[in-house]
Amino acid sequence: MSTAPAVAVTAPRRLVDGRERVTLNTAYVRALESAGLVPLAVPTMLGADRAGAAVAAVRGLVLTGGEDVAPARYGAVPHPRLGDIDPVRDAAELALIAAARARRLPILAICRGIQILNVALGGTLYQDLDSERPGSVPHSDATARHPVRVEAGSLLERTLGTRSATVNSRHHQAIRDLAPGLRAVAWADDGVIEGAEPADASEAWIVAVQWHPEDLAERALFDGFARAVA
């Protein structure tokens, strides 16, 4: 009997009933399990010096959604509408990204994940789309859906199997300046970057999206990640 590959999934800390707990949205677990993977929660309060050990035990890395990335990480001052930040999580995920890339592990970056990946590689973020990009489509409405356009021939297009998709949208931040090591491969109608991947095609499999595929019926991204992990 073959063994299902294990992947690391970042699990943030939350205050629940007055106690600090490590949490993981079960939608990630279900989506990864349905793709034939074993999700292993990696607490984002993990010391940055433990990142290498964390990724040594797995075949891939999933960067999950959550808080805003601290503006200090990309040389900006806090915007008045900046949301909650967790500098400890930032440090842990930056170290996990570096360790995973050093081992050429596949990375699937979701929502905050695309943002921290962009920051890790030298990019910057819009701290609040509504105020910094007036007229943008509603990106922070949990019930909203909007179309995205996917670049032909991109890894994302090959993974999704389509050049267009309708996605959910639960973010108020987004990529401003794209990191030198990434290229944009999906956009909302307002031009906001919704997908990115390595600019160098020889790099390991990395797909980053601004939406939450774990909450959609379509599982192509997780299936593509599983193929890369295998």
Identify the role of each PLM range:
Residues 1-108, 118-119, 126, 130-160, ...:
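N-terminal beta1-alpha1 cap of cysteine-dependent amidohydrolase-like domains
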Residues 111:
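Conserved G/P- and acidic residue-centered "switch" motifs that form tight phosphate/ATP-binding loops
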Residues 114:
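The feature captures the ABC ATPase H-loop/switch
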Residues 207-211:
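Active-site-proximal beta-strand elements of phosphoester/diester hydrolases
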